[in-house]
C-alpha cells in the first residue's frame, strides 16, 4: 500500500506502511499512523498474539437470515453486500477474551443474544445491554419488529466499569443510520454512537478486531486514546487508513 492512501496532511514521518517482519503479523500489511497501528489480516489469527488492551470495541458479523423482505428486499443492495462479504454468518465468541481486555463493547443481532450473553456473563464481572436508537430505520419489518433499535453489550472486568458523566452513562444513544455509501461498507456506525462508546470505555488503549472502515479508530483518536485495528478486507482497510490518517492529522 502506498503512503499516499493516508490523508496528505499527515506528515510522512508519522506514517509507515508495508510489511514488518519484527511485528506480530509480519507477513501482512501493517500501517502505523503515529502511535496507532492497523493490520490487514484475519482477526482470529492475529488478535490473541497482540496481547492486552484496555478496551475492545467491535462490530462483528451478525447472524441473521438475509432472505425475505418482500418487494422492498429487491432494491436492498445493502443486504446483498452483507451476504457477499459474509457479514451475515455470525462470529466466534471466543475472540472475546477477558484476560486480554479490561472491557468489551460488542454490537450484535437480536438473535445472537441468547448465546452471547451467557458467554459474557461467565467471562466478565458485569455487563449491560445498551441500544442505538435509529429515528430513520429501514421501512420494513419482515414478519418481525422494525430495526429501529440496534443492540450492543458492554461487559467489563473490575476497574473497567462505565466512564463519563450521567448523560454519558445512558444505556441508549440516538443517531440516524449512516446512509452515506461513499465509504463502501454496508454497516458503518455513526460518529455519535462510536464517540459515546469510547467515552464509556476506561483506560488508554482501544482495539477493534473487525475494524471495517475505521469508525472506532476515528472516535478513539479524537478522544485521545491509542488505537489498534484489524480488518481482513483490503478495500475497507484502505478506507480505514485514510479516515484514521485524517483523524490523526486533525488532532496533531
What are these regions (language model features)?
Residues 1-207, 211-252:
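Class I S-adenosyl-L-methionine-dependent methyltransferase catalytic core
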Amino acid at each position: 500500500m502506498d503512503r499516499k492512501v493516508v490523508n496528505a496532511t499527515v506528515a510522512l514521518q508519522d506514517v509507515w506502511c508495508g510489511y514488518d517482519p519484527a511485528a506480530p503479523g509480519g507477513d501482512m500489511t501493517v500501517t502505523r499512523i503515529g502511535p496507532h497501528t492497523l493490520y490487514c489480516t484475519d482477526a482470529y489469527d492475529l488478535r490473541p498474539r497482540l496481547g492486552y488492551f484496555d478496551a475492545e470495541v467491535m462490530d462483528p458479523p451478525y447472524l441473521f437470515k438475509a432472505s425475505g423482505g418482500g418487494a422492498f428486499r429487491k432494491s436492498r443492495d445493502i443486504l446483498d453486500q452483507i451476504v457477499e462479504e459474509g457479514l451475515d454468518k455470525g462470529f466466534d465468541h471466543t475472540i472475546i477474551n477477558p484476560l486480554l481486555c479490561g472491557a468489551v463493547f460488542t454490537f450484535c443481532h437480536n438473535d445472537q443474544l441468547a448465546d452471547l450473553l451467557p458467554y459474557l456473563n461467565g467471562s466478565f464481572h458485569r455487563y449491560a445491554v445498551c441500544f442505538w436508537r435509529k429515528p430513520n430505520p429501514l421501512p420494513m419489518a419482515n414478519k418481525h419488529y422494525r430495526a429501529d433499535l440496534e443492540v450492543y453489550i458492554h461487559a467489563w472486568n473490575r476497574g473497567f466499569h462505565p466512564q463519563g458523566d450521567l448523560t454519558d452513562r445512558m444505556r441508549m444513544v440516538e443517531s440516524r443510520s449512516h446512509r452515506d455509501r461513499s465509504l463502501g461498507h454496508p454497516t458503518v456506525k455513526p460518529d455519535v454512537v462510536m464517540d459515546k462508546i469510547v467515552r464509556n470505555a476506561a483506560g488508554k488503549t482501544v482495539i477493534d478486531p473487525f475494524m471495517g472502515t475505521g469508525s472506532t479508530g476515528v472516535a478513539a483518536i479524537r478522544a485521545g486514546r491509542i488505537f489498534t485495528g484489524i480488518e481482513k478486507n483490503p478495500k475497507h482497510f484502505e478506507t480505514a487508513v485514510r479516515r484514521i490518517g485524517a483523524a490523526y492529522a486533525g488532532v496533531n
